[in-house]
């Protein structure tokens, strides 16, 4: 059994990690940490009678001593402090769910702050399994992609060589309120979010550069990207609509299915995607349609799972030589 730790366990992604790992035949929770001590069932009452385990004050060296792999479910800028100390201490591996290792140094410091660990940033692997599977298998540090980038890149990736790069892509993304995190904000307060839909940080959102950088790597050159996220009055789930101009006429369905032909968790839809079909699962559903030289790609994921915790476990599975699909949820909540 591989020994697993979670630092920053008190948030939504921490709970989802616990739920998946408890169903994992090859993983055992060995270390849970947050900013304060207590029983895990005090933080998440739904775990009472399911998991009797203490949450400790986060300590990087203690995590490294007791674990084969540590998930960092910490805020941006905080995760790199723990990652650096763990990686320097011993051979323990790290999957970081923050943005601290996702971007190039230049783009990170543009969007966040001065990076404290450029050495590890330079060899961190971007953890989008469908794209970087072989690199992830060999990695000690994996940067788990953001939810919006996951949903967007998986939609765009099959078509990067057919899109007119001079015109670029427009991404209209909609996410449930859980994407804003557990901390209370005015926009995610019930009276603000309920029965509402609003765009936020249009064009300037931090995830725009993450998407642009990764699709540029896939395309071999930069593709102009306009990204507009929206907060929707649902708890969880995410849908992305991508619009672009094609350089030539293509059979988009054939290209999509060929690109993802061996991917268990990519599903092809004949109609525009529905969030309800993916919430509670590791699946990404994709629909595509073309007309003349225009292309529309529509994708959906669970922002807390495929966009965060189940993707992190998929990365850990590869890093620890476990079956890639181990414990990854497949059945949507539905009703």
Swiss-Prot record:
GO CC terms of this entry: cytoplasm
Active site: 147
The entry's keywords: Amino-acid biosynthesis, Arginine biosynthesis, Cytoplasm, NADP, Oxidoreductase
One of the GO biological process terms: L-arginine biosynthetic process
Localization per Swiss-Prot or TrEMBL: Cytoplasm
Pathway: Amino-acid biosynthesis; L-arginine biosynthesis; N(2)-acetyl-L-ornithine from L-glutamate: step 3/4
Main location: cytoplasm
SUPFAM superfamilies for this protein: Glyceraldehyde-3-phosphate dehydrogenase-like, C-terminal domain, NAD(P)-binding Rossmann-fold domains
Keyword Protein biosynthesis recorded: no
A family per Pfam: Semialdhyde_dh
Catalytic activity: N-acetyl-L-glutamate 5-semialdehyde + phosphate + NADP(+) = N-acetyl-L-glutamyl 5-phosphate + NADPH + H(+)
A single MF term (Gene Ontology): NAD binding
Enzyme class: oxidoreductase
Origin: domain of life: Bacteria
Entry-linked InterPro entries: AGPR_AS, AGPR_type-1, NAD(P)-bd_dom_sf, NAGSA_dehydrogenase, Semialdehyde_DH_NAD-bd
EC numbers, comma separated: 1.2.1.38
Protein family (similarity comment): Belongs to the NAGSA dehydrogenase family. Type 1 subfamily.
NCBIfam families in the record: argC (TIGR01850)
Function of the molecule: Catalyzes the NADPH-dependent reduction of N-acetyl-5-glutamyl phosphate to yield N-acetyl-L-glutamate 5-semialdehyde.
PANTHER family, per the entry: N-ACETYL-GAMMA-GLUTAMYL-PHOSPHATE REDUCTASE, CHLOROPLASTIC-RELATED, N-ACETYL-GAMMA-GLUTAMYL-PHOSPHATE REDUCTASE, CHLOROPLASTIC-RELATED-RELATED
Name by which UniProt lists this protein: N-acetyl-gamma-glutamyl-phosphate reductase
UniProt organism field: Campylobacter hominis (strain ATCC BAA-381 / DSM 21671 / CCUG 45161 / LMG 19568 / NCTC 13146 / CH001A)
Organismal lineage: Bacteria, Pseudomonadati, Campylobacterota, Epsilonproteobacteria, Campylobacterales
């Amino acid at each position: 059994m591989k020994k697993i730790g979670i630092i920053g366990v008190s948030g939504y992604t921490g709970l989802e990690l616990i739920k998946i790992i408890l169903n994992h035949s090859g993983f055992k929770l060995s270390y849970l940490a947050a900013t304060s001590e207590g029983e895990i069932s005090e933080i998440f009452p739904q775990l009472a009678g399911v998991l009797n385990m203490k949450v400790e004050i986060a300590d990087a060296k203690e995590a490294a001593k007791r674990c084969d792999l540590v998930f960092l479910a910490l805020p941006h800028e905080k995760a790199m402090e723990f990652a650096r100390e763990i990686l320097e201490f011993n051979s323990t591996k790290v999957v970081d769910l923050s943005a601290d290792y996702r971007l190039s140094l230049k783009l990170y410091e543009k969007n966040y702050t001065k990076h404290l660990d450029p050495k590890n940033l330079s060899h961190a692997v971007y953890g989008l399994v469908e794209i970087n599977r072989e690199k992830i298998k060999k990695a000690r540090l994996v940067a788990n992609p953001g939810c919006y980038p996951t949903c967007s890149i998986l939609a765009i990736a099959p078509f990067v060589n057919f899109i007119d790069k001079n015109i670029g892509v427009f991404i209209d993304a909609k996410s449930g309120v859980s994407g804003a995190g557990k901390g209370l904000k005015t926009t995610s307060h019930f009276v603000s979010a309920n029965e509402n839909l609003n765009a936020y940080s249009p064009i300037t959102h931090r995830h725009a550069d993450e998407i642009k950088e990764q699709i540029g790597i896939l395309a071999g050159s930069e593709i102009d990207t306009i990204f507009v996220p929206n907060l929707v009055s649902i708890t969880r789930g995410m849908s992305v609509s991508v619009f672009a101009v094609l350089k030539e006429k293509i059979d988009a369905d054939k290209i999509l299915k060929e690109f993802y032909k061996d991917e268990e968790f990519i599903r092809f839809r004949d109609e525009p995607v529905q969030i309800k079909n993916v919430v509670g699962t590791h699946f990404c559903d994709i629909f595509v349609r073309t007309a003349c030289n225009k292309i529309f790609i529509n994708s959906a994921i669970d922002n807390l799972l495929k966009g965060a915790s189940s993707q992190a476990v998929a990365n850990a599975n590869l890093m620890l030589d476990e079956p890639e699909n181990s414990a990854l949820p497949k059945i949507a909540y539905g009703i």
